[in-house]
Amino acid sequence: MNEETMRKVARFINETERELRTVFDRIEEIEYVNQERVLNAFCSEKVSARHFAQTAGYGYDDIGRDTLDRVFAKSLFCEDALVRPTFASGTHAIFTALAGLLESGDVMLAVSGRPYDTLETAIGLDDNPQPNSLIRNGVIYEQVDLNQDGSFDLNGIETALNRLENVKVVYVQRSRGYAWREAIAPESMKPVFDAVKRIKNDAIIVVDNCYGEFTLETEPSSFGADIIIGSLIKNPGGGIAPTGGYIAGRGDLIERIAARLTVPGTGREVGSYAAGYTQFYQGLFLAPHVTAQALKTAVLFARVFERLKLTTMPASNSVRSDIVQALRFNTAQDLVEFCRAIQAASPVDGYVVPEPWDMPGYNDQVIMAAGTFIQGASIELSADGPIREPYTAYIQGGLTYSHGKIAVSRVIHSMIRNGSVRF
């Protein structure tokens, strides 16, 4: 690529960045509010160096673990929380919560359409449900799809609530998974929550909050969610937490889930962590800022692709409720080349060339760019997508906005070399 083309690309990106100043200002205002709330949670719980210590054995009276639970709960507008390094993924945390709340004969009503692929298997929505999946254990699954515009089908939800007996859990997925829709803002969930409390007051509202924490000034718990769940290698870990997940919400429900987390009769009172808790506290403290960096990166990608006349979701000026940006391509090869360009702009394994593969838990081959310090950490700049029509890449994360801007530039360079765009 000649120097003149490279200068044109740099000017193009700088012009795009200037267009986004108002959007970036809004993101920074949200960051400030969230940072102050997290700081207040730390101060309220008198966090000190003793809370970071390593623990071993049963973990009785582990003040680092128990204080971290309370700091997380306050940061997310909740009564209580279980924050555990032992959650292997967000799906693991979600399944633990659902399995702790649902018994044989109970109905799980999903009101945001079909969950994403890995949770489908955990629920038992495959043709042959796996052992220990919810359906194999006697749980009844029902579903109400979203409207075509991505909004809740409130009439359909109310009809289902009136028709079904034994609705124990009403389930909402905040982020899009591999669906072509915007994430659901917490405020938009309130009419559903109100309907649930009016029609089935004893039903438990559970929200998969993955990718959404700290993107707005509120969380689903601000509007009536009973339980919210997420992964520490996404937003709330701040790019620092090396593993884990959280379940937060009503105190009585957290105690019930804790009996499933370990064993009945012991619950949350056990569970040590030999590596110590420093990274989890520090990650939470950094989370509002790192999430804002990821949002700015997503917005820049969106606006650049809009200016290149490609299809994006959400639009660059949309109010965002998660860190994910969807970008649509004409061919499978364009999708693959995009992910390869993201990988090449990564600090870890930047020399690796991603290939589509049969990823456990997914029904189609998936291409993933994940040159991350922490394996699978989608708060770090990463991209992925299933190899199926319409060919869509889902890009998320970015520990620093500068890295995101560099990655945008290198993606454009790759597209020029491949003949996808011209400058």
List each model region and its residues.
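Short glycine-rich or small-residue beta-strand-to-loop segments that form or flank ligand, phosphate
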Residues: 51, 55-56, 82-85, 323-328
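Short, well-structured beta-strand/strand-turn elements
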Residues: 79-86, 348-352
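Conserved PLP-enzyme active-site core in the AAT-like
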Residues: 2-21, 28, 37-44, 48-51, ...
